[in-house]
Design a protein with these regions (language model features):
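Non-catalytic C-terminal accessory region of glycerolipid acyltransferases
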Residues: 53, 144, 173, 184-297
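Conserved beta-strand termini and adjacent loop/short-helix elements that scaffold enzyme active sites
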Residues: 110, 153-155, 180, 258-260, ...
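Proline-centered loop/turn at the N-terminus of a beta-strand
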Residues: 21, 124, 149, 199, ...
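Conserved phosphate-coordination/catalytic loops
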Residues: 21, 106-109, 180-184, 223, ...
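Catalytic core of membrane glycerolipid acyltransferases/transacylases, capturing the structured
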Residues: 121-182, 210-212, 217
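Short, flexible loop segments at the rims of nucleotide/cofactor-binding pockets, characterized by
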Residues: 101-107, 176-181, 219-220, 267
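Membrane-anchoring hydrophobic helices of lipid-metabolizing enzymes
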Residues: 2-129, 174
Length: 297
């Protein structure tokens, strides 16, 4: 596939993303000139090959489905194949949005009014999400519909040549990226965004070795979650909601938001609420769990 999360099959995420510039070029060409349908058809071939030869992520997912979600072996194998295919679709969809083909997609938004209420309060909003579904596409859908500006906090881990090609070929993302850096400048950027009544979206599911964490029960097992996103959610005087975007049809997405947290809470308290919601989403969309490493220590 054109992008794979680093350390697939390892014990924690290493923050790196691998990708093929040639792969991006091929799919961008097909999307632009032959359409999404043809790109999806090509994707079936690519992901079948990936399923056969990418042993580590395949084994990790099989273990997750079988031993964590208690799904039978045959069904688990089908889920793994579907997982790889939908993950590929999310990458194709992301490129399609950036190429201006957003009208080919439809979406529903569960509790959209929560985000509208957050916007009206004028304090900005912190949106915690996970590597489940396709948050980048959600960011593209939200901009202009609910807020003029949305910021996504992430490790700037894409291969630079791919990032440059995507910017050159598509005109760039419709949302701002706040890169996490060692000098903590991202904290200042988050603060400024909230002051300007902007939304700030953060993935809160991936723990990196050596980072501070909170250990919580998740799907019946102990798992480490990064404490940083929850400290940010607790520190700033802005409403906090958990937002997810799952693919629910060939060209459609289902977005959802939880009732905003507007009272002061400890980071660990917010983390527990987040994990409870994440559990629901994983059970609802098991084929869209895109963490290809051993999530449980």
């Amino acid at each position: 596939m054109s992008r794979q999360d680093g350390n697939a099959g390892g014990n924690s995420w290493n923050g790196k993303t691998r990708g093929s510039l040639t792969g991006y070029k091929i799919f961008l060409f097909f999307i632009q000139f032959l359409g999404l349908g043809f790109a999806y058809l090509l994707l079936r071939i690519v992901t079948f090959y990936y399923y056969l030869f990418a042993a580590k992520p395949r084994i990790v997912l099989l273990d997750f489905y079988h031993n964590t979600l208690q799904i039978s072996g045959k069904t688990a194998r089908k889920l793994v194949r579907r997982n790889f295919y939908i993950f590929g679709q999310t990458l194709v969809d992301r490129a399609a949005f950036l190429l201006g083909k957003d009208k080919e997609f439809t979406h529903t938004f569960e509790n959209e009014e929560y985000l509208i209420d957050i916007r009206e309060k004028g304090k900005g909003g912190i949106l915690l999400s996970a590597h489940l579904g396709n948050w980048e596409t959600a960011g593209n859908l939200l901009k202009g519909r609910i807020t003029p500006t949305i910021n996504i906090v992430m490790l700037d881990a894409e291969v630079e040549s791919i990032k440059q090609y995507m910017e050159l070929s598509t005109g760039g993302s419709r949302f701002k990226i706040i890169a996490i850096k060692n000098d903590l400048s991202h904290i200042i950027a988050i603060r400024n965004a909230l002051i300007n009544n902007e939304f700030v979206a953060i993935h809160a599911d991936r723990y990196m070795e050596g980072a501070k964490f909170t250990e919580l029960d998740f799907l019946g097992k102990k798992a480490k979650f990064p404490i940083g996103p929850f400290i940010i959610a607790s520190k700033f005087d802005a409403p906090v909601t958990f937002v997810f975007a799952a693919k629910d049809g060939k060209y459609s997405y289902h977005l959802s938001a939880t009732l905003p947290i507007t009272t002061k809470m400890k980071p660990e308290e917010i983390a527990k609420l987040y994990v409870a919601e994440l559990e629901k989403k994983v059970r609802q969309y098991p084929e869209q769990w895109f963490n290809y490493f051993n999530f449980f220590q």
